[in-house]
UniProtKB/Swiss-Prot annotation:
Protein name per its UniProtKB record: Cytochrome b
Cofactor binding: number and manner: Binds 2 heme b groups non-covalently.
One Pfam family this sequence matches: Cytochrome_B
Taxonomic source organism: Trimeresurus stejnegeri
Keywords: Electron transport, Heme, Iron, Membrane, Metal-binding, Mitochondrion, Mitochondrion inner membrane, Respiratory chain, Transmembrane, Transmembrane helix, Transport, Ubiquinone
């Protein structure tokens, strides 16, 4: 039995140089494209949430309630954005685990661009976690940003600068919202570089053979 449909599909991809990988890859190689889908969902839902969100310590939580209750389909946007973030991390950890297991780290440029992406993603998620300004948001902002004080000489100055004062307050929330809004564009840029480098070098496969073997 020969799957001609699958063969023609692969041939089309190879014709346009869109498949820098052997045909022996497994399901574990799906998570890269799934991460791109997650990015698109997060950016679209995030944009609609940002329209109705208010970056003020007295109004932030109320604006979240307003999105859930009053904005048409706001509850879908909010839940999709929150659950989508968890899905994003599930996909990225599986993506990294596959890379570790099959030795993708040998492709240094792709691996380092991916590491940079993970750091930016974790920072973006942290800033987003703070935005509802609930009890846990306040606690997270205090604890995580306080880690900066461990840096010798510069720590206290850096923390004060990040907070916008001597304690977490309105300026902190405003800049966290600005960072949460701008960092996804850095993620898009780094993702483009990540994919460009991957297509330049070629992906790994379960056997560790050359990407152009077939």
């Amino acid at each position: 039995y020969i799957n001609y449909k699958n063969m023609s599909h692969q041939h089309t991809l190879m014709l346009f140089n869109l498949l820098p990988v052997g045909s022996n890859i497994s399901t574990w190689w799906n998570f890269g494209s799934m991460l791109l889908s997650c990015s698109m969902i997060q950016i679209m839902t995030g944009f609609f949430l940002a329209i109705h969100y208010t970056a003020n310590i007295n109004l932030a939580f109320s604006s979240i309630i307003h999105i859930s209750r009053d904005v048409p389909y706001g509850w879908i946007m909010q839940n999709t954005h929150a659950i989508g973030a968890s899905l994003f991390f599930i996909c990225i950890y599986i993506h990294i685990a596959r890379g570790l297991y099959y030795g993708s780290y040998l492709n240094k440029e792709v691996w380092l661009s991916g590491t940079t992406l993970l750091i930016i993603l974790m920072a973006t998620a942290f800033f987003g976690y703070v935005l509802p300004w609930g009890q846990m948001s306040f606690w997270a902002a205090t604890v995580i940003t306080n880690l900066l004080t461990a840096i010798p000489y510069l720590g206290t100055t850096l923390t004060t600068w990040l907070w916008g004062g001597f304690a977490i307050n309105d300026p902190t929330l405003t800049r966290f919202f600005a960072l949460h809004f701008i960092l996804p564009f850095a993620i898009i840029s780094m993702s483009s570089i990540h994919i460009l480098l991957l297509h330049n070098e070629g992906s790994s496969n379960p056997l560790g053979t050359n990407s152009d073997i077939d």
